Design a protein with these regions (language model features):
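A glycine-rich beta-to-alpha transition motif near the start of alpha/beta enzyme domains, typified by
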Residues: 1-137, 185-222
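Glycine-rich beta-alpha junction loops
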Residues: 59, 147-149, 180-184
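Membrane helix-loop-helix hairpins that form the core translocation module of multi-pass transporters
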Residues: 140-148
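Active-site glycine-rich loop that binds ribose-phosphate moieties when present
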Residues: 149-173
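Internal active-site segments that recognize and position negatively charged phosphoryl groups
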Residues: 164-196
Length: 222
């Protein structure tokens, strides 16, 4: 199986295609893909990455996956699987890396100024990535992630308000929740010195799976 390794603002991604997975002898369904993602993303025994991204044509439909949004207007489809096997809707850094890989595989359109547009169907909707090429074969990739969502039922958040209280780091705090493709829980601190880096991962995991978030959430301390 041929797998590319990409990095965007510190997040790293392993990227391949449905065809590569099938040609390696696997049946493409959600259970198989989760197992493959866990193995590939493992930093000790696999390639090592934050996520596995998988490319397919815009007629993609496979067992166990949710319906993609914007698929009819897209050039291709992006499957996104976290290292732990969970399936988020979107990754801002991932979508740009994915679009670069997709263009290398022949997807997208090029205008008269050599700028490239790749339309990608995701679980969070159609995302359009534009690469503006500059000198020395460098390019700047940008994507419109759409407006942030604050309505609790759309985030989704089990609350009447996207401003919620949370007891964290021995203090009750006012925090804020939004969705920019995936849910984000923003928790203000008086100082970043409040964070114990040794226990940060454990704290983040506990908050990520808070029962108020039916689809889990990213956790951001500011």
């Amino acid at each position: 199986m041929h797998i590319g390794k990409y990095e965007g603002l510190g997040n790293d991604f392993a990227i391949t295609s449905v065809r590569e997975i099938q040609d390696s002898g696997h049946i493409f369904n959600v259970e198989t893909v989760i197992d493959i993602a866990k193995k590939i993303c493992n930093r000790n025994f696999g390639i090592g990455s934050d996520d596995l991204l998988i490319l397919d044509d815009n007629n993609s439909k496979y067992e166990g996956f949710r319906e993609f949004v914007g698929i009819k207007d897209s050039d291709c489809v992006m499957y996104l699987i976290n290292a732990d096997g969970s399936i988020p809707e979107m990754s801002g850094n991932g979508i740009r890396c994915f679009a670069q890989y997709a263009n290398e595989q022949g997807y997208g359109t090029t205008d008269s100024e050599n700028n490239i547009t790749v339309k990608v169907a995701t679980l969070a909707g159609l995302k359009i990535v534009i690469f503006n090429y500059m000198e020395s074969n460098r390019c700047m990739g940008k994507v419109d992630m759409g407006p942030a969502i604050f309505e609790p039922h759309l985030i989704p958040l089990q609350s009447n308000n996207n401003v919620i209280k949370v007891n964290v780091l021995e203090k009750e705090r006012i925090s804020y929740v939004t969705n920019t493709g995936i849910p984000h829980w923003v928790i203000p601190l008086d100082s970043l010195d409040e964070l114990n880096l040794d226990g940060l991962e454990q704290l983040g995991e506990a908050l990520r799976f808070d029962e108020r978030f039916p689809e889990n959430t990213n956790v951001n301390f500011v």
